[in-house]
């Protein structure tokens, strides 16, 4: 992160607002497409029961995103303050700490989900007739959930001085997810595991791009 990538001190408020707003909005749109894409491909390629299993397992997705929002928003505020004071090294440490701690925390949650998928599915209220589908998706998704959290955290830090970079990283991640969803579900017939793996790979690519930028 660099302090002068966007001149907050001299740029007009309207221009600054637009410079931050539109890339951020587009990035959020592409982020939402992650979920929408999975729903469309799962529903059309696997069936309604599989789509129901994915939707019932959604609280895990929300938890991972919430973890990312908590660490990302808080950490980015602290980093922004340090950048304003000219402490770029401290701001980079803030980004590293927020990303690593959230990644580790979500990894621990994922391990629990993968160790007890049936119990988690029952807690989430999954009907017995689709519990195997829910187990399949929970195990596959949990293996990559920490990258969703990390991607969310990194997006906040990248937006501090590179809102367009954050937007393009999310765009690339979403496109990869769409392409892999089609390949894994319709071509290779990997089912719900394929849908989760496609999403995970897209998120990993997004994380790599943002880490390279930061």
What positions do the PLM features span?
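Short alpha-helical transmembrane segments in multi-pass integral membrane proteins
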Residues: 1-24, 79-144, 187-214
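Residue-level signal for short hydrophobic patches within transmembrane helices
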Residues: 14-33, 37, 60-67, 104, ...
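Helix-loop interface residues and adjacent transmembrane-helix termini in multi-pass membrane transporters
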Residues: 33-36, 45-48, 82-85, 159-161, ...
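Interfacial/gating helices of multi-pass transporter permease domains
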Residues: 42-62, 129-136, 192-193
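Hydrophobic transmembrane alpha-helices of multi-pass small-molecule transporters
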Residues: 63, 177-182, 207-211
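Alpha-helical transmembrane segments of multi-pass membrane transporters/permeases
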Residues: 89, 102, 157-182, 193, ...
